[in-house]
């Protein structure tokens, strides 16, 4: 998962929301660890000032899936990157297609951000 640029690891829901709201762009998204369900991830998407969160998990066989709107057929993907690519298209069961990845910026110092704290959210928005 660490190879996925939009994966922010163990950040809080509040931190994820702040990062997305700071972009001000509908369709901005990131992935983070779920705070309530171990081993599950959250795909967080900004739309009209609200953050929509979809649980993403890996099956025992290694496939990836996301919880989407009721009535939408559940799909499975071999790689998390394939799941993200699929949700960049319209009508996939999420509020808006994924458009603007909020990537975790690699730190110049391997584990510390600009303030010297390990939890510093060094991020940047990648626009198409």
From Swiss-Prot:
It is found in: Cytoplasm. Residues 6-102 form the SH2 domain. One of its GO terms (cellular component) is cytoplasm. Its main location: cytoplasm. This is SH2 domain-containing protein 1A. Cytoplasmic adapter regulating receptors of the signaling lymphocytic activation molecule (SLAM) family such as SLAMF1, CD244, LY9, CD84, SLAMF6 and SLAMF7. In SLAM signaling seems to cooperate with SH2D1B/EAT-2. Initially it has been proposed that association with SLAMF1 prevents SLAMF1 binding to inhibitory effectors including INPP5D/SHIP1 and PTPN11/SHP-2. However, by simultaneous interactions, recruits FYN which subsequently phosphorylates and activates SLAMF1. Positively regulates CD244/2B4- and CD84-mediated natural killer (NK) cell functions. The keyword Hydrolase does not apply. Residues 104-128 are annotated as: Disordered. Residues 67-92 are annotated as: Interaction with FYN SH3 domain. It comes from Bos taurus. PANTHER family: INOSITOL POLYPHOSPHATE-RELATED PHOSPHATASE DOMAIN-CONTAINING PROTEIN (PTHR46051:SF1), SH2 DOMAIN-CONTAINING PROTEIN (PTHR46051). One of its GO terms (biological process) is cellular defense response.
